[in-house]
UniProtKB/Swiss-Prot annotation:
One of its GO terms (cellular component) is GABA-ergic synapse. This is Rho guanine nucleotide exchange factor 7. Residues 295-400 form the PH domain. Its main location: other. Residues 93-273 form the DH domain. Residues 415-428 have a biased composition (Polar residues). Residues 500-512 have a biased composition (Basic residues).
Length: 646
């Protein structure tokens, strides 16, 4: 190829080329380049889109002068002879690209309809899969197919208008909200469809082949279900090509650019949703290490989930966590060191939870704060602004729904260890009547752990409000009524106790009541009497401490105020065995006892791990010793060994 004085050398790119130096020229496959300088060594200089630079000559081919422009219906457009109008070239290219968009939309719509009518609808009427699995496979593909038919009709209407009045970009923008909703929903369902394909691959493959699909049939179905993603990725490229050959003053140019940006964002969102749903499906189906409580499937459906970075109050350490929002709680998980599974870190009830969106600073970006009367303050940093918006919106909506279903009286200032009030019971003047059954809300009592997350959950029964209505009262901290067998013992206590309290412990009774013969027969055995005596000691200790607190605090409250339960002050009798073998009976608070028991459990777990490790090492050593002994015995019995050692 040589350049002559009569005509300039024009070439077409055979491959994409991306510049690595400032003096090089970038181009895409099919671009037309005007060569300005030909040098030996494989690098030429040329001009493309107003830029001049060097490019490899083996990436292009020469456009011969005999090649002429073709009609818009052809797939390629040849370089015109010298002197041909450039505007006509752009118009011809524009028509070619527009026709290509319309034809591929027709083809895509027919492919979706074919997958539905040939395979999925017959599969729905057959008994190969359950109705749930079939619905996972179909997803909302029917809605997408109907939408694509509407899109094709809209594009056809655009092409009927004169070129200067065609609004292809405006057509895409007007349908973008509906398209976004449909494709995001399809992406969210696709991981479940893939799971069904994997689990029932053999049955589905046989069914597809009976319907005329080529072998392997499962591959045909997998490809058909992936077509929406493949088509979505092509829109930005097609619109970019249309914009390149559009006149600068075309009224649709700005809408085309907006459509390109919208499709790029939609494609990125779809990929993110698919990854998030795949991770969510993995968490829900695989076992979680150190899991506590009921099975994760009993928590309901996942409202939202993502990977975040958390930082607990008073700590500088930041940890990566996976947060999953369920209807009534927020689940926190961490990934195992080798990313082979997930580890349970804790649950946070949405009841009483407060969400505060934070401004960006040097220490955190895209962050919000979780706080509450029963929740240790947690700083959550999201990966991007969209993730932050989703979390704040879902959590605020969830906490509002929870607060409506479980109405509570919010205190003005409450320490983190206290419990919020519970739903109001009927007025105290109806205390003699049968109490109304209410479902108490559960709360989490925070205590120190390796991850700083609350674990212990305590349920409290419905309580009566004080006579004087207040926004917050210590009477809301009283415990649930004792069980009826224990309540019978309370009846034998000092009758000087408040009659109002006794009415809560026992149903309305006659002034003088004697134990029946049946009750006397039940308590006749020695074992029953010993058990009752032990229970009575616990109740006596409780009543003694309660009376003492009531006497000390009588100056700060009315005498008619009911007794309260403060977890940090409530005492119980604990029997401990010291290291020297001496048994000591001590009085400890409930909180201290819970923490002490937790520490003991952790020590037992560590001891168990050490014993298990020692046992494994001993077993390995015994196996090695056994192998060595067998080898020695074999050598001793080997005749060849005897000859060599004579």
């Amino acid at each position: 190829m040589t350049d002559n004085a009569n005509s300039q050398l024009v070439v077409r790119a055979k491959f994409n080329f991306q510049q690595t130096n400032e003096d090089e020229l970038s181009f895409s496959k099919g671009d037309v380049i005007h060569v300005t300088r030909v040098e030996e060594g494989g690098w030429w200089e040329g001009t493309h889109n107003g830029r001049t630079g060097w490019f490899p000559s083996n990436y292009v081919r020469e456009i011969k002068p005999s090649e002429k422009p073709v009609s818009p219906k052809s797939g390629t457009l040849k370089s015109p002879p010298k002197g041909f109008d450039t505007t006509a070239i752009n118009k011809s290219y524009y028509n070619v690209v527009l026709q290509n968009i319309l034809e591929t939309e027709h083809e895509y719509s027919k492919e979706l309809q074919s997958v539905l009518s040939t395979y999925l609808w017959p599969l729905q009427t057959s008994e190969k899969l359950s109705s749930a699995n079939t619905s996972y496979l179909m997803g909302n593909l029917e809605e997408i197919s109907s939408f694509q038919q509407v899109l094709v009709q809209s594009l056809e209407e655009c092409t009927k208008s004169p070129e200067a009045q065609q609004r292809v970009g405006g057509c895409f923008l007007s349908l973008m909200p509906q398209m976004r909703t449909l494709y995001l929903a399809y992406c969210a369902n696709h991981p479940s469809a893939v799971s069904v394909l994997t689990e029932h691959s053999e049955d589905l493959g046989e069914f597809m082949e009976t319907k005329g699909a080529s072998s392997p049939g499962i591959l045909v179905l997998t490809t058909g279900l992936s077509k929406p993603f493949m088509r979505l990725d092509k829109y930005p490229t097609l619109l970019k090509e249309l914009e390149r050959h559009m006149e600068d003053y075309h009224p649709d140019r700005q809408d085309i650019q907006k459509s390109m940006t919208a499709f790029k964002n939609l494609s990125a969102q779809c990929q993110e949703v698919r990854k998030r749903k795949e991770l969510e499906l993995q968490i829900l189906t695989e076992p979680i290490r150190s899991w506590e409580g009921d099975d994760i499937k009993t928590l309901g459906s996942v409202t939202y989930m993502s990977q975040v970075t958390i930082q607990c109050a008073g700590s500088e350490e930041k940890n990566e966590r996976y947060l999953l929002l369920f209807p009534n709680l927020l689940l926190m998980l961490s990934a195992s060191p080798r990313m082979s599974g997930f580890i349970y870190q804790g649950k946070l009830p949405t009841t009483g939870m407060t969400i505060t969106k934070l401004e960006d600073s040097e220490n955190h970006r895209n962050a919000f704060e979780i706080s509450g009367s029963m929740i240790e303050r947690i700083l959550v940093s999201c990966n991007n602004q969209q993730d932050l918006h989703e979390w704040v919106e879902h959590l605020q909506r969830q906490t509002k729904v929870t607060s409506v279903s479980n109405p509570t009286i919010k205190p003005h200032s409450v320490p983190s260890h206290t419990l919020p009030s519970h739903p109001l019971t009927p007025s105290s003047k109806h205390a003699d009547s049968k109490p109304v059954a209410l479902t108490p809300a559960y709360h989490t009592l925070p205590h120190p752990s390796h991850h700083g997350t609350p674990h212990t959950t305590i349920s409290w029964g419905p309580l009566e409000p004080p006579k004087t209505p207040k926004p917050w009262s210590l009477s809301c901290l009283r415990p649930a009524p004792p069980l009826r067998p224990s309540a019978a013992l309370c009846y034998k206590e000092d009758l000087s106790r408040s009659p109002k309290t006794m009415k809560k412990l026992l149903p309305k009774r006659k002034p003088e009541r004697k134990p029946s013969d049946e009750e006397f027969a039940v308590r006749k055995s020695t074992a029953a009497l010993e058990e009752d005596a032990q229970i009575l000691k616990v109740i006596e200790a409780y009543c003694t401490s309660a009376k003492t607190r009531q006497t000390l605090n009588s100056s700060s409250r009315k005498e008619s105020a009911p007794q309260v339960l403060l977890p940090e002050e409530e005492k119980i009798i604990v029997e401990e065995t010291k290291s020297n073998g001496q048994t000591v009976i001590e009085e400890k608070s409930l909180v201290d006892t819970v923490y002490a028991l937790k520490d003991e459990v952790q020590e037992l777990r560590q001891d168990n791990k050490k014993m298990k490790k020692s046992l494994e090492e001993e077993q390995r050593a015994r196996k090695d010793l056994e192998k060595l002994v067998r080898k020695v015995l074999k050598n001793m019995n080997d005749p060849a060994w005897d000859e060599t050692n004579l």
